[in-house]
């Protein structure tokens, strides 16, 4: 089975093509360009290099959040455009689960660059908790704790101070990865009292191969959705939406593709319309999709 993986939930845009459990090709870029500029050309390059085409795909696995609202929509829009055009099912993959997959087979501490904490005596029987942390701004992170590849509890947006306090009560060993590591590395090193470490640079950020591998597992289990039913998971509402609710502002009118047609829309719709359109009528009928796709 052939699966395309896409992750544009953070600063890195990444796509990968896997066949069964073999990674045929992976392309990641963190070069300061917007994902709308880089993602589709990267996908085209992967198919060109491997001699495959979109029509060969059994499914497209997409990072469905949490993460950058705009980035998530660009990934979803790209996947939906391809899926609608070729009749391919989609697979929703948690961004945090994808990050945890980066280090799922590496044996914990041995895969890391630093280990610290007051309680440094660890044994093979000590539980290793993997904590993907993504910068959610305002001293918060998107995170979840994974034990043996399984989410423990729920994914959440939480203050970094509260997260550190909770982890200190847990014991065991703790591995951190994600784009919030460079932001809060020093804070964690200062405030954690348990054994902890950080993932090595090649595994620190999102990788589409991890998304695709999880997607392959879900495909075999029949866990696919149509383009129409695909949903992104933001965990928390955009700041504009929260401010609107706090101030009691009512919904307002915006224009979509047809300036003569107005409809009531929430701030979510406004952001989607201004940043990147997703779903049916995603705009792909007006864009040039490379012929080799």
Annotate the PLM regions.
Residues 1-64, 278, 293:
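N-terminal beta-alpha supersecondary unit
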Residues 22, 89-205, 234, 257, ...:
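Surface "functional belts" at beta-alpha junctions
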Residues 30-38, 69, 73, 77, ...:
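Residues at secondary-structure transition points
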Residues 46-50, 85, 103, 208-219:
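Stable alpha-helical structural segments in soluble proteins, enriched in small hydrophobic residues
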Residues 63-95:
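DPxDG-like acidic metal-binding loop motif
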Residues 201-232:
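Glycine-rich phosphate-binding/hydrolytic loop that grips phosphoryl groups
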Residues 228-242:
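A short, charged, Gly/Pro-tolerant segment at domain boundaries
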